[in-house]
Amino acid sequence: MTISTNTTLGKIAVLGFGNPVREDDGVGIYVIEKLKEKLGEPENISIFDMGTAAFEILFKLQGHPRIILIDAVLNSGEAVGTIFKLPASEIDAQIQDDPMVFLHSLKWDQALSYAKKMLGDDYPENIEVYLIAIDDIRFNVGMTDAAMKGGDKVVNLLLEELEVH
């Protein structure tokens, strides 16, 4: 299956997910904004604000041998701002072959499962996930200081990991 023939994409794609009007749920978007602020548009890195459009991940995977996903994790049992880093292979979301599955309500982990099925051999092997612990997703623009500090830590980790200073 071929979705994109864009050869100008960076080798690394960084995708941030979240909803900035659901308080700390916007932390993935916050990280993306900070990365764009610090990096601009580097040649080898594509930075995407995915918002809540998880199924769009399918269109961002191709052409990027390395993918980094950033999102919030609710009710992790850890303090707000705690960072978890894991390979996407450790996250196995169940997918349904039901044609009535509402694509707009998919989460990115489910979208990854669909992408793996649809892309087959074109599915990137190197997908890392950064999750930032949160405990509040009420309707409110802005984030708590603890979530913001967690987001800042992820930005710094990514700048180191991507060897960008």
Describe the predicted segments one by one.
Residues 1-125, 129-134, 141-152, 159-165:
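N-terminal catalytic or cofactor-binding beta/alpha core of small enzyme domains
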